[in-house]
C-alpha cells in the first residue's frame, strides 16, 4: 500500500491521535518502527510526549535515531511534534544534560519560572497561545504555516522549550506571560512544532494539510 506519511513508533507518543488527525485530512498513514518502511515514505512524523531522555532512549534502542537523521538528509519533509521537535535539536537540559539528534542546532531549556515582571507563573505551560511571527520573518509563505494569520491559536503542554542557536530557525513564536517561546522551528525540509496540531482544532488541521502539501 502506498502511503502519504509514516509515523515513527518508538514506544512513546500519542501515535493514534496524530494518525487520526492526518487521516481526517485525507492522508494514507502508516505507523511503523521498520527503518525500510520509514525511509521509503514520502513524509515522516516524529511525535512524542514525556521526558527527553526517555524519548531519545526509545529511538536509540531501536536504532531509529539514525533513520530520522538519514530521512532529514534526504530532503523529504520531516515533522517533529512536541517532544519530537525537542529531540530534533542538539542537546537538552531536562533532568540532566542529554544529546539530541542534532538536526537543527539548538538546545532545550526550562521555561523560566517567573514572568518578565518577576512574578511566578504556572509551569508547565498548558493551554492555548497565539502564533507570532518572529521579528526577522516577513511571513509564513512557502512553509507549512502558509495561510495562517498571526494570532491563530494552538494548544501547548510543556515545561521545556527549544532555544535555537540561530534565530533564523524560528518559524513561529508564542508569548507566555512575556516570555518568548519557540512554537515552531524550521531548517529546510525539517519542521518542529512545540504545540500539538492534532489538538489545535481547525488551525492544527490546516497545518497538517500544509505538511501534506509539501
Region spans (language model):
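Short acidic low-complexity segments
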Residues: 29-40
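Pocket-forming structural segment of enzyme catalytic cores
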Residues: 93-175
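Beta-strand-turn-beta hairpins that frame and shape the catalytic cleft
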Residues: 151, 186-190
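Short, surface-exposed beta-strand/loop micro-motifs that present aromatic residues
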Residues: 179-186
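Cysteine-nucleophile active-site neighborhood
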Residues: 50-126
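Acyltransferase
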Residues: 2, 190-214
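N-terminal beta1-alpha1 ligand-phosphate binding loop
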Residues: 5-26, 198
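Structural signature of beta-strand start/N-cap positions in the alpha/beta core
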Residues: 28, 43, 77-79
Amino acid at each position: 500500500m502506498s502511503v502519504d506519511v509514516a509515523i515513527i513508533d518508538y514506544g512513546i507518543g500519542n501515535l493514534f491521535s496524530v494518525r487520526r488527525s492526518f487521516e481526517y485530512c485525507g492522508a494514507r498513514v502508516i505507523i511503523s518502527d521498520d527503518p525500510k518502511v520509514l525511509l521509503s515514505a514520502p513524509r515522516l512524523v516524529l511525535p512524542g510526549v514525556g521526558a527527553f531522555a526517555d524519548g531519545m532512549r526509545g529511538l536509540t534502542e531501536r536504532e531509529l535515531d539514525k533513520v530520522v537523521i538519514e530521512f532529514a538528509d534526504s530532503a523529504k519533509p520531516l515533522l517533529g511534534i512536541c517532544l519530537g521537535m525537542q529531540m530534533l535539536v542538539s542537546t537538552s537540559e531536562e533532568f540532566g544534560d542529554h544529546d539530541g539528534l542534532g538536526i537543527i542546532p539548538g538546545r532545550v531549556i526550562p521555561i523560566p519560572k517567573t514572568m518578565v515582571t518577576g512574578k511566578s507563573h504556572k509551569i508547565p505551560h498548558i493551554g492555548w497561545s497565539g502564533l507570532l511571527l518572529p521579528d526577522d520573518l516577513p511571513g509564513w509563505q512557502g512553509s507549512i504555516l502558509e495561510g495562517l494569520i498571526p494570532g491563530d491559536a494552538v494548544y501547548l503542554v510543556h515545561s521545556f522549550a527549544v532555544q535555537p542557536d540561530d534565530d533564523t530557525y524560528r518559524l513561529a513564536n508564542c508569548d507566555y506571560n512575556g516570555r518568548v517561546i519557540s512554537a515552531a522551528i524550521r531548517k529546510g525540509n525539517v519542521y518542529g512544532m512545540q504545540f500539538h496540531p492534532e489538538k489545535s482544532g481547525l488551525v492544527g488541521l490546516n497545518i497538517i494539510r500544509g505538511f501534506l502539501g509539501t
